[in-house]
Amino acid sequence: MKTLIRKFSRTAITVVLVILAFIAIFNAWVYYTESPWTRDARFSADVVAIAPDVSGLITQVNVHDNQLVKKGQILFTIDQPRYQKALEEAQADVAYYQVLAQEKRQEAGRRNRLGVQAMSREEIDQANNVLQTVLHQLAKAQATRDLAKLDLERTVIRAPADGWVTNLNVYTGEFITRGSTAVALVKQNSFYVLAYMEETKLEGVRPGYRAEITPLGSNKVLKGTVDSVAAGVTNASSTRDDKGMATIDSNLEWVRLAQRVPVRIRLDNQQENIWPAGTTATVVVTGKQDRDESQDSFFRKMAHRLREFG
């Protein structure tokens, strides 16, 4: 009798353990397959393409590639003597027209005071018209001077914000044209993550939900918050022909590939360019609250690691 009870107890314990293991594995599998996550995520940042507003020879480069710079710091300088001479010429024109305008103003005033008793109306009108023409030329010269001053100021290229200089491709002695990108500036404290979630997982993604970000090749888990979900993506299977008619690509009805939708995630703490913009990461959206790692089972931890490595 005791032997029978012992065998029954062992069998019952084995069955219970198998059931518990199955439940744990099933929960881990659900966690792995159904909760919102993706390995297709990238660190991003606000990038400013810096281009000069004037053309000329580069006379001085004050920074080096990948340097952290402050807002207003000089990056490089373009040929200033040429623009200084242009400003001096414009200032001379302004001075000339100021003197000429004063003379014509006095002449017109004198003729207006004398009136038609001393001269004809035509002569009076002519003096007034000459004055207006000179005043117009003076205003034009002043505008040219202001533009020359602005051009001279813009020969000094400064950093528009704190950030890292990257892809610096200007050197002393080179000629640079107006509007050509000289350097990119990655803004400091502007890093975020773009996670490309499958449309089937968007039900569990909402602005304000918490997220975990694991950079590729790192065991460190960063925390963040879902900032926004893209309002639309391009329909790659539909185009228009030259007559404006819709062209729909053929596909297999039983094979439907889920579209990926960009989800922007705001990082809790900026990482000071430890993971540069463009590097990849794994993102898991944990819901309204952070995941309690102390409550994770062994199988769930395994599932979490599987997400990171494939």
Swiss-Prot record:
The chain crosses the membrane at residues 12-32. SUPFAM superfamilies: HlyD-like secretion proteins (SSF111369). GO terms for biological process: carboxylic acid transport; transmembrane transport. Keywords: Cell inner membrane, Cell membrane, Membrane, Transmembrane, Transmembrane helix, Transport. Its main location: membrane. Induction: Positively coregulated with aaeB and aaeX by AaeR. It comes from the Bacteria. GO terms for molecular function: transmembrane transporter activity. It is found in: Cell inner membrane. It is a single-pass membrane protein. Gene3D superfamilies: 2.40.30.170, 2.40.50.100. InterPro entries: CusB-like_dom_1, CusB_D23, MFP_Efflux_Pump, PHBA_efflux_pump_AaeA, RND_pump_MFP. GO terms for cellular component: plasma membrane. NCBIfam families: PRK10559.1, RND_mfp. Forms an efflux pump with AaeB. Belongs to the membrane fusion protein (MFP) (TC 8.A.1) family. This is p-hydroxybenzoic acid efflux pump subunit AaeA. The gene is aaeA.
